[in-house]
Amino acid sequence: MIDFSNFYQLIAKSPLSHWLETLPAQVAAWQREALHGKFREWERAVEFLPELTPWRLDLLHSVTAESETPLSEGHQLRVENLLKNLMPWRKGPYSLYGINIDTEWRSDWKWERVLPHLSDLTGRTILDVGCGSGYHMWRMIGAGAHLAVGIDPTQLFLCQFEAVRKLLGNDQRAHLLPLGIEQLPALEAFDTVFSMGVLYHRRSPLDHLWQLKDQLAPGGELVLETLVVEGDENTVLVPGDRYAQMRNVYFIPSAAALKMWLEKCGFIDVRIVDACVTSTDEQRRTEWMTSESLADFLDPQDQRKTVEGYPAPLRAVIIATKPETQQSLAKKAR
């Protein structure tokens, strides 16, 4: 069984220590009552993977691990087959001992768009909400973060993360918990909170923004990446049954409306730093994700529209700050 005790020990003497009042019981309940029908199969694939210590590890420019001596053909094939038991791989890519996991999304492209606008991540404690398999957490560590904590209730993502971690020498600087943000208490302890590709899946987007704010320490930075539409501060698309074949898309605001929402929730220094149309080069079917992808969700006659007739996916990145309090300012002045 995937073990979270290392994480509990890690946060016991940190600003996250009060999380231990609820977290172990939540994880234990998940292990007893909420396991996916294929979870044991996925977990066995992780267990059968060797724990490898990289001779060369690059998390700054990619997620790449290499050994001093290449794996034998048989050893590499065995590792690759175990990793393929965890398909589909959606977020990446990863290059692990000569095995290139070509994921559905080029998440490295998103990271390259976001990174120039971030405050220095050196020494920061970070929360990544809806972190998927954890690709961006490894890039956060590569950029100098002290600790990256991801939450995502999708259990396949947890097993993918644990598989990658095992092949990175059981690196303890990143951790993934199988929870949704609504299960977190107001920790107010993270220096940076990322929410990328989550907001449009929330039935109440303003509640989500408040939940993100509740996780930030005073003065902390929010990095919000989400679908948007063109328009002014009053523009919000509410799709019908589906958007780009996704059923669970509720609200897609304009970037200007989203900026106003953040300000309404009490964030300051709100700025739109990037907007980019998602291309079929960035999200596509691969050997590691063989089902439908973006090309199947766009109008074949007009790729500026989804198959339902809505504007094609446009994603914006917004950076915002949680205000300092008198108490936090006094503490920093000491």
From Swiss-Prot:
It is an enzyme of class 2 (transferase). Coiled coil: none annotated. Keywords: Transferase, tRNA processing. One of its GO terms (molecular function) is transferase activity, transferring alkyl or aryl (other than methyl) groups. Its EC number is 2.5.1.-. It catalyses: carboxy-S-adenosyl-L-methionine + 5-hydroxyuridine(34) in tRNA = 5-carboxymethoxyuridine(34) in tRNA + S-adenosyl-L-homocysteine + H(+). Carboxy-S-adenosyl-L-methionine binds at K91, W105, K110, G130, D152, P153, T154, I181, E182, M196, Y200, R315. The keyword Lipoprotein does not apply. SUPFAM superfamilies: S-adenosyl-L-methionine-dependent methyltransferases. GO terms for biological process: tRNA wobble uridine modification. Catalyzes carboxymethyl transfer from carboxy-S-adenosyl-L-methionine (Cx-SAM) to 5-hydroxyuridine (ho5U) to form 5-carboxymethoxyuridine (cmo5U) at position 34 in tRNAs. Belongs to the class I-like SAM-binding methyltransferase superfamily. CmoB family. NCBIfam families: PRK15068.1, tRNA 5-methoxyuridine(34)/uridine 5-oxyacetic acid(34) synthase CmoB. Homotetramer. This is tRNA U34 carboxymethyltransferase. It comes from Klebsiella pneumoniae (strain 342).
